[in-house]
Amino acid sequence: MKMTSKKMKDELMKKLSRPEWDFQYDSEKEVLRIEQKDSKKGINVSLPGVVAKWEVNKEKAIEEVAYYVQEALIAMHKEENSTAKILPVIRSTSFPKQAEEGNPFIMTDHTAETRIYYALDSNKTYRLIDERLLQKLGLTEQQVREMALFNARSLGYEFKQDTVAGNTFYFLNTNDGYDATRILNESLLQSMREKISGDMVVAVPHQDVLIIADIVNEIGYDIIAQMTMKFFAEGHVPITSLSFVYEDGDFEPIFILAKNRKKTDGKEKG
């Protein structure tokens, strides 16, 4: 049979078919590109050159090119993952539990309103870890959780501060994608607890903000409720409009509206 660039493209695509790789064919330049779906890194194969080799070596030429492409892409993937970090991310409990049907994300319960997911972050790409990715990484769920919490503790923090009606509010907003993640840093929470004189209230309205408040009066509770609702509405990745009282390592959701309603009802009765 006569081999053409189009036929060679079809042969190589059959040999290199993998769910994590994509193909792009430029018919004008007669170039087939094979790339990783996640990182978009890949290899360009000039098909006329492969056809010329096929004229001499037949099937062996196709095998050699396929082997070269496969090894190069696998090496790229390993290099990328070797520099990648696993970090926890906070999401709402309404966030999807599966990447797709039959492929659940790796998750850990956090509060009544929030859940912990895990991200593989290589600076350029960011992907939530699901069971299939977990297998590719060759890690257990427990290893992922331990690595993620360790890396979360290494995230820096510098709060901006504001005081209203005697209540002090501390804001963390670095926009690194992991501001809400700092809620998992127990030593950070303990150090803030030591400097707070009233109730310690914590909020993660969206991915890119962590609010810690020193609440000393009812006005403070009203302010944190309004503030959290505003941030929640504005966030690209909203998490929860509720804030939490932090005490002895536990987070208790504050149902501000119910609290205010009871207060109002009491005044009306009196």
Curated annotation (Swiss-Prot):
Cysteine pairings via disulfide bonds: none
Pfam families hit by this protein: DUF1444
Family as reported in the entry's similarity comment: Belongs to the UPF0354 family.
Protein name as annotated: UPF0354 protein BALH_4267
